[in-house]
């Protein structure tokens, strides 16, 4: 029984770790998206300041070109993180399923132990009743 409790605690810990990993990846994606939006605003501001909106124009601001590159890198990184997020969610689901299996086994064992205990108690009560009946005690 003790090993089953330890196993349940281990599975709960694993589920918590997977949840933290999912939350961490989601946070990183949100940060990248926020930074990308900030860069887009900076690009727009720089384009308005220079009066040039075409990145291929020879006088296009260097800062805007660099910001576009950073924004693209952030977008690419966020896309890669989304793939990792799907994998992490899948692992979380598997860990949760494993936890549920162990918990169900534990519940089944506890129910069986309760039934055995009830059967022993009933047998004891039956033997007491039988002895009283043999002795003629009412």
Model regions and ranges:
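Charge-rich amphipathic alpha-helical interaction elements
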Residues: 1-138
């Amino acid at each position: 029984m003790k090993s089953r409790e330890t196993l349940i605690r281990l599975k709960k810990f694993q589920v918590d770790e997977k949840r933290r990993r999912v939350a961490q990846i989601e946070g990183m994606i949100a940060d990248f998206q926020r930074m990308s939006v900030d860069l887009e605003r900076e690009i727009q501001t720089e384009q308005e300041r220079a009066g040039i909106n075409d990145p291929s124009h020879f006088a296009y601001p260097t800062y805007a070109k660099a910001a576009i590159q950073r924004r693209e890198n952030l977008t690419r990184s966020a896309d890669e993180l989304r793939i990792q997020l799907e994998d992490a969610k899948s692992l979380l689901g598997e860990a949760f399923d494993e936890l549920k299996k162990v918990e169900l086994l534990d519940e089944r064992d506890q129910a069986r132990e309760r039934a055995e205990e009830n059967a022993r108690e009933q047998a004891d009560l039956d033997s007491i009743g039988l002895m009283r009946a043999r002795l003629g005690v009412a």
